[in-house]
Structures are given as C-alpha cells and as structure tokens.
C-alpha cells in the first residue's frame, strides 16, 4: 500500500496525468460552450499540456485561464478561419458524396476535395499547439502548421490516430471516456510533438517567459 501511494512510482504519475487530463477536459468543454471561444480554449489547453509534458506545470487552472486571456484574439481569429474552411469542405463533401460516381469530372473533384481535407486536417492538428508556444501572424501559424505536419509526417499520423481512437472509443466502446476526451488527446499529442517544437524553435516558451519577466 505504501508503494502505491509513493508519488515517485510510475503508476501514481500515470494516474495523476489522467486526473489532470480529465480536469483540463472539463475546463476546455466549459470554455468552448460559446463555440466562438473554441480556439482560445484549445490554445489554453495545449499551453497547459505542453507544460505538463515538460513537467513544468504549476497550477493548472491559473495557467489555463492565463493562456486563454493572452491568446484570445489571435486564437479566435485562427479558429474562425479554420471553422469557415472546415464548413466549406464539409458542405462540398456532403454534395459530392452523392455525385462522385456520376462521371469523371465529379470523381476528380471529389479526389481534390479529399486531398484538401487531408491538408486541412494536418493544419488543424498543429495550429493551436503552435499558437500556444509561438508568437506569429495568423498566416504564419497556418503555414508553419502545414510545413511541420508534412515534414514530421509520422508524428502527424500518430496524433491523428490518437484523436481517431478516442473518438471510436467514445462512440462505440465506452461513452464515459468523453470525460477524458480532448484533455487526454491534447496531453498525449503534447508528449508526441514536444521534441518537434524544440527542433523548430529552440526553446518555444522563451517568448512567454520574456513577457512574464517584463510584466514583473
């Protein structure tokens, strides 16, 4: 029993991370309810989970809402752009799913749409984590997300699998898993992409720390 309660044990560390991810998932869900704030809440979520991946988390709630406030405007702008593009692709997909086999034109158009959807998915995976760790323009974030996603394709596929498996588990296997949901996915993806973030920018948190120092 003493071993189970030892905070240095791997089992305790795993259970702690799971508990944290469930709590962060609740914060993310609540802050995403207005829909328009999904970008800011997702950026805040990744800000915290990337800190967790570095074992530098200190006060989950405080860090979450700090990142939420600081990134609200750029994250909302980024989210609205991605939402508009995603809605356009979804609407086109709904139409083409009924017409793709009618002739070669619709088949080629459907193939083009699928390719665009894949590229969109790649950008979506990296956009908010990058915004959580780097200061950049909206176009810069989108461009970097695409380039990073294509260059580190294996990590991209793993991250996509994390979200896909979680979605499958929630829908078909164990619905209460939604309590972990986005929080768990963000935490796993943060561990997967942390090394990449260092490779593309040295210390990606330096900008945030400089701002904190200036404020003090």
Where are these regions (language model features)?
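Helix-coil boundary and N-terminal low-complexity module in membrane systems
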Residues: 1-100, 104-109, 113, 120-216
């Amino acid at each position: 029993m003493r071993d189970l309660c030892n905070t240095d044990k791997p089992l305790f560390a795993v259970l702690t991370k799971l508990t944290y991810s469930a709590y962060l998932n609740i914060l993310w869900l609540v802050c995403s309810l207005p829909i328009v704030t999904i970008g800011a809440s997702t950026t805040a979520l990744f800000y915290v989970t990337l800190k967790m991946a570095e074992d530098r988390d200190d006060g989950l709630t405080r860090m979450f809402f700090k990142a939420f406030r600081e990134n609200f405007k750029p994250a909302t702008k980024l989210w609205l752009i991605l939402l508009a593009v995603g809605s356009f692709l979804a609407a086109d997909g709904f139409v083409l799913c009924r017409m793709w086999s009618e002739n070669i034109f619709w088949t080629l158009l459907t193939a083009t749409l699928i390719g665009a959807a894949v590229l969109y998915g790649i950008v979506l995976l990296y956009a908010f984590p990058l915004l959580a760790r780097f200061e950049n323009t909206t176009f810069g974030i989108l461009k970097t997300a695409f380039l990073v996603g294509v260059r580190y394709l294996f990590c991209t596929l793993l991250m996509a699998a994390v979200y896909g498996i979680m979605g499958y588990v929630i829908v078909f296997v164990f619905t209460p898993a939604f309590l972990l949901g986005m929080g768990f996915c963000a935490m796993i993806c943060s561990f997967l992409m942390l090394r990449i973030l260092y490779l593309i920018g040295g210390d990606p948190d330096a900008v945030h720390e400089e701002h904190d120092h200036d404020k003090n």
